[in-house]
Swiss-Prot record:
Pfam families tied to this protein: Tfb5
Protein name (record): General transcription and DNA repair factor IIH subunit TFB5
Name of the gene: TFB5
Assigned protein family: Belongs to the TFB5 family.
InterPro entries recorded: TFB5-like_sf (IPR035935), TFIIH_TTDA/Tfb5 (IPR009400)
Assigned GO CC terms: cytosol; transcription factor TFIIH core complex; transcription factor TFIIH holo complex
Function of the molecule: Component of the general transcription and DNA repair factor IIH (TFIIH) core complex, which is involved in general and transcription-coupled nucleotide excision repair (NER) of damaged DNA and, when complexed to TFIIK, in RNA transcription by RNA polymerase II. In NER, TFIIH acts by opening DNA around the lesion to allow the excision of the damaged oligonucleotide and its replacement by a new DNA fragment. In transcription, TFIIH has an essential role in transcription initiation.
Subunit-structure text: Component of the 7-subunit TFIIH core complex composed of XPB/SSL2, XPD/RAD3, SSL1, TFB1, TFB2, TFB4 and TFB5, which is active in NER. The core complex associates with the 3-subunit CTD-kinase module TFIIK composed of CCL1, KIN28 and TFB3 to form the 10-subunit holoenzyme (holo-TFIIH) active in transcription.
């Protein structure tokens, strides 16, 4: 018997998809289905967690010259 469950469709570019896969690699409870290179079906309760972790990853990878001046 098929099961139906409500999910959230995430559309993103392949680089963001790779980050989401990395976030999910520890627990394997975020991504329900990898649909293609730009679409993921995820647990709707985890969407805000995904956004928080993506913001953290992206802020960590942004070059900020003012931080370099503060920490010589």
């Amino acid at each position: 018997m098929p099961r139906a469950r409500k999910g959230a469709l995430v559309q993103c570019d392949p680089s963001i998809r790779a980050l989401i896969l990395q976030i999910d690699s520890g627990t394997h409870d975020i991504i329900w289905e990898e649909l293609d290179e730009t679409h993921l079906l995820v647990d709707p309760a985890k969407v805000s967690y995904i956004k928080e972790k993506l913001n953290w990853f992206l802020s960590k990878n942004i070059y900020n010259p003012s931080e370099e001046e503060e920490n010589p």
